[in-house]
Amino acid sequence: MKLAFWRTSTKAEQENISAAVAPSGGGIIAALRRSLAPEPDWPALEEALILSDAGTATARVVIDEAKGLRDGDGTTRLRSVLLKALDDGANASPADVRDPSVILLVGVNGAGKTTTAAKLAARAQSAGGTPLLVAADTFRAAAIDQLRLLAEREQVPVIEGRPGGDPAAAIHDALTAARVRGLSPVIIDTAGRLQTKHGLMDELAKMRRVIEKLAPDARVEVLLVLDATAGQNGLAQARGFDRAAGVDGVVLTKLDAGARGGVALSVCRELSLPVRWVCVGEGSRDLL
């Protein structure tokens, strides 16, 4: 068993991921390898995991579990524990952009929700779907313009919210249009918000209620778009958004931008959330 996005990616896509993260992750991987041979240097391994943004608590648990195993060398034991920690959050169905009929993207400002929405639409379209994009970030007029341009590039229809208006109204219009026109999935871009702003987080809960009321039979997937450069703040984001909107999975962005990505380990281990997709570039095909 592997990560949700890894299980369904092709060999070429896996190679693209490895190539994209090599510049930023190579030093961490080298440190892990040095600490594993010939005998495990457990304190050095713990430090390497912390430097990868896995967090102190997660790093300590991983090392303690690896030390407790009896079968295999240090590399085998550490790999086993890491994969288990990641897979505990990936036990849901494999990432398939055609499967959920409604995808709600949430996250803080600048995480990459708008571009991720367009990438998901392109992915769905190439897989035979008929996606509909929804510009429900009504706080930032530029976000509506950006999604419109991306939708035109991918030749995907888009429903736009009114600047300053109620995003739930845009979602209502989109779900109605999708039902009439037979479009799926409906991919909703929302405004960025801090997980500490309770009023804005309550708005996300309202959006989910609207979706469940208008499309009671739809399979809804709430995806947290998480900037891999956020470090351990990403774990706090995941907790906050999960409480407000019931997050089903994570899209890890900017892995090609100097990120170590260890926060994914903390999110998977502590919240049991699968990493559905990773973004390793700006192109529509850089969602894997």
Regions picked out by a protein language model, each given a short descriptive name:
Residues 1-105, 120, 126-133, 153:
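Non-catalytic terminal/linker segments enriched in charged/polar, low-complexity residues
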